[in-house]
Amino acid sequence: MAEVKVEVASIDWQKRCLSLETQLFRFRLQASKIRELLADKMQELEQRLLEAEQRAENAETQVGVMEEKIKLSNLKSVDSTGTLHQKYQELLRAVQGKDELISQLQAQLEKQKQTRAEEAKIVQEKAAKIKEWVTVKLAELEMENQQLKTCNQQLVEQVAALQDALEDLRMTPSEELLVVPEGTPERDPVPSGPSDQPVEQDSNPHTQILKVAVPTPSLGTLQSRDSLSEARSLEDLRFSMVHPGETAEAKTLQSHLQKEGSPSQLCMKPGNPKHGSASYRESLVTAQGGTFPGTKTSAREGGPGSSLTLPKVRAPSIPRDSFQVAKRHHSQPQVGPGHCDHVVSIEIGALSALHSPGSSKSEARAKVREEAEKMEMEALPPSGKQEERESLKSRRGELEDVELENKPPTPPLHRFPSWESRIYAMATSGMQLSEVSSRRSNAACYASGPSALAFPGAFSGLVYKNVTVPVYTALKGKATQISNVPFVDESSGSDDDCGSQASFRMSVPCSEYRKTSGLGSPRAIKRGVSMSSLSSEGDYAIPPDACSLDSDYSEPEHKLQRTSSYSTDGEALEKSGYLLKMGSRVKTWKRRWFVLRQGQILYYKSPSDVIRKPQGQVDLNSHCQIVREEEAQTFQLISGNKTYYLTAESPSLLEEWIRVLQSLLKVQVTGPPALHQGGTKPTVKGWLTKVKHGHSKLVWCALVGKTFYYYRSHEDKRPLGCLPVQDAHIEEVDRSCDSDEDYEAGGTGRLLSSHCTLVIHPPEHSPTYLLIGTKHEKDTWLYHLTVAAGGSNAKVGTVYEQLIGKLMDGEGNPDSPLWRHPMLCYSQEGLCASLTTLPSEALQTEALKLFKSCQLFINVPVEAASVDYHVSLAQTALQVCLVHPELQSEIYCQLMKQISCRPPQKYSLMQCWQLLALCAPLFLPQHHFLWYVKQQLQRHADPRSETGQYAIYCQRAVERTLQTGEREARPSRMEVVSILLRNPFHHSLPFSIPVHFANGTYQVVGFDGSSTVDEFLQRLNQETGMRKPSQSGFALFTDDPSGRDLEHCLQGRVKICDAISKWEQTLKELHPGKSEGGTRVVKLMYKNRLYFRSQVKGETERERLLLAFQASGEIVAGRFPVTKELALEMAALMAQVEYGDLEKPTLPGPGGTPPTKAQHLLQQVLDRFYPRRYRNGAPPEQLRHLADMMATKWAALQGCSPPECIRIYLTVARKWPLFGAKLFAAQPAQLSPKENTVVWIAVNEDGVSILDHRTMQVNITYPYSSVTTFGGCRDDFMLVIRSIPDQSSGKTRIDKLTFRMPAPKITETTLMMASYMNHCSATVNLSAKLPAARQPRDLDGQFFASVSCTKGSALL
């Protein structure tokens, strides 16, 4: 045992363990190898098994075929009569018949399914219509019931008051009835002058009710003057007892109505307690007479909508009769003033619901909605009325019993929580600014004002590339752009506008229709007045000042024919007729009689003035130009330094005038480039001398596709002519040709001794000679003309171009040895000459420099730390190609050369592909080069390799560029870095950028190098669950690179990459000394730009949330009027949405401090959601008190969900009539800059409003129907207004308003107004196309007479 123990002790167990582990490891290696071998063997056996099974199946199939063949051969030999074949044919026909039957049954089944689906859809539509009708009907009945209750209550009170008056009448002598009680506050009486004088009111019009009974004598009612005076005495008594403080005013009002002779019409003008409206109105008016559209005036006497009386009713004897009468009120038509007694019951607070003819229907609908909300949130009656009702109970017990028996059941009302009702009640009078100290208010005022009036930066010119500040006019209710540059007062001729004064408001009285003369008067027919000359010939209407029937417009038109065309010769062609001309100072349309005669255009006020001196004259010579925008209903006649904006009364007359002027000037109308369609751009262009039939002319030439165009100048967009090049014979000729000698003898002598000559000889046409200045230009034109003609001249062009031509002739045969030609493949050495034909030696030098830049980009490895080196190289090279389009094909050829047959050096080849990936979204090469690039990309496309994936990415980029067009700016740093440091082929959208929202969140959206803003927003809306911008009104904005508080709206056709690049470029120009990388990046914001009330029903939750946060931002910035109390309530709602329920603060310890977390949160809420003007300069005690009140308001919202808070917030905010409007700070141009008077210009769906900058009270509102012209005028914003015709004088006023604003704000204001006008026009046209039964019922028509259509203009 001892020996065994010694042996065991002598064993080294550690070495033993290591040896065993080594053996185990070797065993595992052997086992893994065995498993691998076994797996390979099994896989091989399985593959062999599959192959064997496949062979067996093939063999079985062959055996079956052979057996069938043997059977057929046997059957044919046995049955020689062919009965089997006949049976086979019968079976085949049966199978075909079955198939046809099955197909017929399937078609019937599909038809039945479609029919069932259509029937179900029709049923659903009918159900929806029925539901909508029932809802509208219930709302109407509920409103009618509410008003009937109110009317019944008022009638009961009147009966009770009359009973009391009768009782007092028996006890009081008649001499004491008209004595005014002592203590009655005196009021200014209403003057008995014109009917539109204002009636003084109390400062709180919502709590007063003016009840006036005005009896009018009619047959069967009052038979004598005594009865009339008695009724008046009773009414005076009743009125003095119910409202003793208003007795004198009511008496004066009655006497005033009696003097006017129309007691059924009451013209009132609610007084504004704020002095801003009156003073602003007085400062604007420069001439007497006429009313301004949009002003808060009542309906004039005799005008539509001015009757405030109830229809004829019989005197009720009991309350039951009065209830029946009131119930019958809405179904009876209104009768004239001389047929019945009228009882006028007017609520002064609701006087604004009565619209003048110039007011818009949308305001009336808003008032109806407010009334509906008031009925929903109806609280208990005021205590004063309750006490009055209690005092009358004892005197009318029987009447109340009768009333209770006949009173309908009270409809169920939706009752809001107490705190919500309190917010709504506060909102009814809280849409105004609270008073603050003058120092604080001025600080807040100028904090929001001057920043908006700052001078614009350089970025605005880049974002709005061609459109600096446009000018729009209203034609047929639509906003039509007539100029893309601001107006200059003298640019349009001033011969007919000498009487106007260039000031802030210029007024031009215009005559309206004479009431004594009509279109059908015998005098007009006798004098030969044409109907078409006095009214519109097409679907246009004539402006009010253009359709006057004064004597000077009634001359016979046979004196000078309306349209006379005697010859096609320029000097002999004559024409005359009416055109609408834009005035030079007051930018509005004026109807003038134009005469085209002897190469001149003369215009007069009327045809009768042709014997006098013309108001203007235009000489039509070779310097004249006709400009017409695409699909525009206006055109510009440019002569020298003057531009005449003209339009006709119908599209046919407009086309006729343009055609005549075009024939006279022997040029086509200049407009947008119609020949560059589908992304096609000129292959080569330049100044050439064209010689044909011995006549030479220096023209601007461009080769587009296979057509040669020539223009008068490089600025023209319509050619003088064109020449087809397809199959033409192109060659260079010596200078001994006749046309050359004739040209030199002509003395033009510009290219006398060094020019080259090319001839273009199309089939079946005479040859045309081109005289070219230099050899480089000649080579370029010769090569591109030869390629366009389809020639195969091997000696034309460079060697590279000749090889591409040969490949095209071989249709890109992949086995052609030309693909491996040394000229087409990679070369390590630099180029000695350009690969393409270039028109000048300077461009050839640039091509060689471009190749060196590409070589540096390709051969230097890209590192993340020094990526800016490659960014600068790529941007510089591509910027050169954008500046010189001739080099765009050159850089593609250079990159294709360096990619083809390149040695396998990974990073160099990848960087070459990356540079190509940067080129593809920017621009494309021309024609045959583009074909060659596509062939090369197809040859390299391979999803298994990295270079092949780059080729596939470049293919997609080329196709996208062909679809969406080329870019305008070089790639941005973000774009270059994304291509260099990320693999773009792994993503369908290789770039991404965050889009910020008003609530502080953001959404990352992907895009590619060709994505437009419309495509970008479509992806954004899909990811966020929002509607398209045409419905939601949202738009994409960028911040300003200068850091100022400016935002720039991006148009839908702009490309995202271009906007980012221009932003970065502007930032570098503003900070040239900083590093290339920089720390700032562009910030994209998605905000509401246009607000449409008709689209409110379809709002999504996300839209409502963003709209609430945007409104909160406007409140904080001081661009939304709310009182301090209402601002606190709304800030608490936003705090509940943003942070949830307010946590109860924990009590501090014995030696602790009060909780600072809650205080910090409250301070943060006040900073984010409470108006700055109410916080700035406030003492600390007031701020602490404000925080305590905020905590109380916030705690009351415990448990309220964010969607519920958003609903309440928007309901409150929408009580401001200008909710959704965009406010722009501006300064009236008639004031000197030292005065520093700033106003708000509010642009909304209904029109343009001018607001006081300090109080935000509306001074005046101009509906879009009164706006004729708007946009830039020099450096200011111009607004031309046509007022409503005055009914007494029949004249209108043309007012031109100008405001000082920054150029970006002017552009944004103009574009926003145009968007609103076109949207309103489209909505009106859509509703007009609907059947009458489907049109929504206008609630305004239930109470007021509809506004009748005026005889004004539909054109303006």
UniProtKB/Swiss-Prot annotation:
The modification Phosphoserine is found at S451, S739. Residues 27-172, 359-407 form a coiled coil. InterPro entries: Band_41_domain (IPR019749), FERM/acyl-CoA-bd_prot_sf (IPR014352), FERM_2 (IPR035963), FERM_central (IPR019748), FERM_domain (IPR000299), MyTH4_dom (IPR000857), MyTH4_dom_sf (IPR038185), PH-like_dom_sf (IPR011993). Residues 991-1327 form the FERM domain. Residues 194-203, 256-265, 285-297 have a biased composition (Polar residues). One of its GO terms (cellular component) is cytoskeleton. Residues 572-666, 681-790 form the PH domain. SUPFAM superfamilies: PH domain-like, Second domain of FERM. This is Pleckstrin homology domain-containing family H member 1. It comes from Mus musculus (Mouse).
